[in-house]
């Protein structure tokens, strides 16, 4: 049902309710169907009174009744007196419905089987009990009368008969089946129930019971507040959908193809008719009951086949598609027909490269254009008087008359077309171009737009769409043309950057000088200006003639020939800024550079190219940039061709020292093997060390190889190096495999095979090496196929959760923001501050540190690149910026909190669909990530350096570091969160430095995070020089270290229970290993000051898997390793960690092996064991507050007794549970954690996504709160409501002087967040369709069509982008309705 808006015939809202029998019979239906027949198989005419009856549904032929008495349009509206058919259009058969009157009421399966069961909740009965009643197994008491039976009590046959004998037939009422349920529902008093439930809620203390009650209360409340009556969930008649929606199509050979629904309806009618017949006769009860049950099952199958019992099978043993299946899933009504419509005026063809095109053009095959623009051509042909009827125009077009081509040329001018390549992962997958007519049948596209479409020319196809209306053409022209889309919306980086051949040509042109005349005792040439250089180049005839001592082409001797100028010769050139040294090649390049950029005098790999394009856009504007890009394309292809670059097998050099290095490595591996056999190290360590040795060899050989191929000999360069260095093709790892060695490979399981492939591709692989190689290659391909689907699904969920987020106002006026700082890993800066703050709005005035007169940015400024750089250079560590996470706009977000539009570096416009842009920006690289695994062929990389080396002169200072000095004179770190700092030598004392560091008054030159067990080689306060080794750490084990000297005693190390002796097979050496156990033991090593073991110094709990390194009774010195826990063997770093990790974060799932985190600030203490778990206590010294943590033995503690921890710090290894961060540290910390964790995964892959996109998704995950105390509001305990709705409700109550409700924020995963949207249409089209619709119908929900999806489904213009203003009017109407106190609410 919908309310229409008179002026444009569009409705504003849609309400869904339960249909009562009255509505079905009197409002929807045109008549009752009594026969199961469909059509007469001889005449092919519909049977009367059957499922296709013309009397009920309307005529099968336009303006013709069934018997043929009336046959023309003039009889319109007459009902034939012979056959009873109304004379009208046959299309009414698509809209007229009928009904089937049932002999007994049946239960609608959705309301009974969709959990939580609505009927069960209203009646307060369990599903199992209901099922027994509905399917005629037991009686239920409806009215106990004077007996001592209870209402709703179940009775089986025997009990029912006994009760009748005991109290008499008419003393009580008990029934079974749908009828019984209907009577119960009708006699249910919902108002009293509500009062009772609220009363119970107030009295109960138990959480579980309260949740249960609140759930039930919500369902009953929804019935009370809507006009739905509970008994409508039981049907006494079934609606029949129009026949043309379930057609019966004759196939050749006299057979018919039919929709499954017809079979399901026939079953219902057959059973219903049989039941009616049986009821007329006096039939035994058992048979009647069975027949009634069969009717109930037939109706169930019609509505939702397979929900109850076995699904009904059709021909070929396939389950029939019921009404529910028609809606569900990818092939269902929502996703197939409403969201994924087909487009008219479209074509598709293979694409080929069109290097001659301009940036805004595409080549369109003539024949295709003729077909696509046909209506336009027809109109133009008529206007110009070539033809008079449409038919003759079409004929003219079919015979390809010459006039037609002229007309087509004319029409196409200024009429853009859209090109699209599937999969469309982000908005750059559809762009508009000016068509250029070409011969042939392939579409031509400009080489620079390929990267946006992710297209290549190995047979890709693209689709062409023609925008028809003037508005559509305008949008295409103004917003979608390729030149307007040269930056990625995800990061603001240019996407139209020359690649492959173009990069190669440009790099070749811009090479550093290869030929220096001074080396040949000649003078460097000097030129007046660029013109002169170009003239000299033209005159020199030859292009790159390098052969020493050879004859010139036309036989003159060499000295004469050298008057010619070489493209890579060093020359001097006069420019505006004085005389510079450059090469003729660079002069040629600078002829196309916009003058605003100045003279470019450096070599130009692909990375620099992107920066140059960006710079050009900022200094010279869009038009100049597009021109520049076109010129880059032309000159790049030209130079690549002229350079005649080729590559031969001999260009792949093999380092001469390869054999020696390999020999050394084999020896080192043998030493490790020997250590293992002697029992000094474990199997895991041996494996890890072997892998490390080979990784190192691989690196050393690569270095050698790159030295070798990057040499310039006789002013020529290695083409292989040229390709790699320019970024045109190939990367270091691939070239390493060609010339050095293939290196370590991974098994399909992800483990690294420890014997590497020592051959390279130039030498060729042996058979065994080939087999190992194929492992990696196959895994790559299999992964790709699987993960592409995963990634697509992630994008779909992201779009669904963020689709409603649009820019709805300019400034929400909030004072809140988030603090951002540069992202560092150890000492290197991964992402500088300027990149994180550029284009964002600052919350407060920012002054130069130490100079409060110099204002760097005013509060409310959107930072430009220059401002961002100035702030970064000034040494400010972190600044506060506005963010969508703190935006206070009621619906959508505001422009100030969002910042700039990355796609064009301008401020974001109203109505921009930033949510969808965010979802695409995160999802699109997801597919890239998944597709990127196999290029390395499963090559293993294990990165972590085992030593810390100083880079600067300075003084070594420890901070937050507990150390102990060992006998060898080193210091060992005892905790995990300490740092080593190297600070500038300013002649202060050590304590002063420490104080300055702790207050962040000085910045260390370098800061290293220190792992537990790191061996520090220098005392603090030592002066260090660059290259000094400061510390080293064991990368294969996590050590457990003794911090005070004493005698060792084992506690609870019981062999066979908590430990096992593992005899090393090679050596016979026994090792004591702590194993996982269930019991009251807590294995630890105790240290006593005396041999009698009375004076306890300290205890060290041992986690499962630890290998004990000390004997009982021996004297352990400080710093001695008591036990070691092998780090799990290194796995390859594949994105496999990536995509599932991103999904895990966005779905807010609990990670496997999660970490325990501290709930308060304080000092750590251990308190023994309880139920096989260690008790760790954190005690706040100031307040005396304590928090207990129970930690299982299998987890490794990363804190020691006496460590000071802060709230939210990890106590054990593993990943943190996001919900815990929310509970312990609050919303801000959680937001920061989620954004940083997601960014980390993408950064590892080198994918650049702006923070704001991830922030939008996180905002959507945190938009609900859970009510913990309803106060005087109408909210329920444990109910999850929108933050905004909660605030409105509280305002209302506090104005009336009542008690406000209390709530805590909840974190929802993206799937759950999408399903909990206010719009039931949007939720139903996403997932769980039946559940969403059932819930909405019970509550009589209204959808105000405010989001995108709902409007697409309804066929309205979407309320974003250019459709935004149009919906402003609707918003006014909604706001006025709200003021009148009508109840409804919006998605956030």
Curated annotation (Swiss-Prot):
InterPro entries: DNA-dir_RpoC_beta_prime, DNA-dir_RpoC_beta_prime_bact, RNA_pol_asu, RNA_pol_N, RNA_pol_Rpb1_1, RNA_pol_Rpb1_3, RNA_pol_Rpb1_3_sf, RNA_pol_Rpb1_4. Its EC number is 2.7.7.6. Its cofactor is Mg(2+); Zn(2+). The RNAP catalytic core consists of 2 alpha, 1 beta, 1 beta' and 1 omega subunit. When a sigma factor is associated with the core the holoenzyme is formed, which can initiate transcription. SMART domains: RPOLA_N (SM00663). Zn(2+) 1 binds at residues 65, 67, 80, 83. It catalyses: RNA(n) + a ribonucleoside 5'-triphosphate = RNA(n+1) + diphosphate. The gene is rpoC. This is DNA-directed RNA polymerase subunit beta'. GO terms for cellular component: DNA-directed RNA polymerase complex. Transmembrane segments: none annotated. Belongs to the RNA polymerase beta' chain family. GO terms for biological process: DNA-templated transcription.
